[in-house]
Regions:
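Accessory carbohydrate-recognition regions in carbohydrate-active enzymes
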Residues: 13-255, 259
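Bacterial Sec-dependent N-terminal signal peptides
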Residues: 1-14
Length: 263
């Protein structure tokens, strides 16, 4: 996994893709557009895009250049802010207290500590002293979180509102779930099923429902479900998360090629 991240910038040095700045066009808002884009990390014709999220849950302007806080790193399928998104969910690393609500977990960031390429994204979350990196395949993604020395390091999984589900499986270092959030144009049984596998055993687990944290449960379903897993970390410790998703199959029957992309 470390080799993948190490070679990403090397491979792109002599490639036209390395000249692409995905932050161009992100200084937009409802009242005024300068592009209405977001910094997508994606493969050509990829099933899923990923993006840092500065806007509130459900805000079509998911990332705006003038914002100074990141609230999560979101899987997105959004074609434009006017059409909004569907099937979205997000990950967010935090340190210190156990939180879930999007504004409580948000962290200040600077564009000086941000790298945004079509194939790779990196940012330093100052409030949590965590560096987040993302890269993708056609159907899956890989996260690397670099934590400080901290007894209370966490990763939040937010399946968003309007109907979602989370199950934490500690013995497999795994979280599964689904998101049904959408803005129309989907069938009644629409779900985006996801599976997230970590490379470090969980020392803490909790779920959340409508921002209320429940530490005695590992499974939750309702309007707005989420999960929280925690670790004790040493300075510079890197934790990886592999993510795959499917619109068609339940997590139990997720296709082997999709599993392999995540693994």
């Amino acid at each position: 996994i470390n080799t993948i991240f190490f070679y990403l910038p090397v491979l792109a040095n002599n490639s036209p893709v390395d000249y692409v700045n995905t932050l161009v066009g992100t200084q937009s808002k409802f009242e005024l557009s300068t592009g209405n884009t977001y910094p997508a990390i994606a493969m050509p014709w990829g099933m899923n895009f990923w993006t840092p999220q500065t806007g509130d849950m459900g805000d079509g302007w998911t990332y705006t250049y003038n914002a100074d806080k990141i609230k999560g790193f979101k899987q997105t399928h959004q074609p434009s802010p006017w059409m909004n998104d569907y099937g979205q969910f997000a990950l967010m690393p935090v340190t210190g207290g156990v939180v879930f609500e999007q504004n409580q977990r948000a962290s200040w960031f600077s564009h000086k500590a941000e790298i945004a390429k079509p194939y790779y994204y990196k940012v330093y979350l100052a409030d949590h002293d965590v560096t987040t990196e993302m890269t993708v395949t056609e159907r899956a993604s890989l996260f690397r979180f670099t934590f400080p020395e901290e007894q209370n390091s966490y990763v939040i999984v937010d399946a968003f509102d309007k109907g979602s589900y989370i199950k934490i499986i500690p013995e497999e270092n795994k979280i599964i779930g689904y998101s049904t959030r959408n803005s129309g144009g989907v069938p009644e049984n629409f779900k985006n099923y996801f599976i997230i596998v970590f490379d470090k055993p969980f020392q803490f687990t909790a779920v959340a429902l409508d921002n209320a944290i429940k530490t005695n449960q590992t499974e939750i379903e309702g309007n707005h479900a989420g999960g929280i897993i925690g670790f004790s970390t040493h300075k510079g410790e890197q934790i990886h998360a592999r993510v795959a998703s499917s619109f068609i199959l339940s997590l139990i029957h997720i296709s082997e090629p999709t599993r392999q992309e995540a693994i």
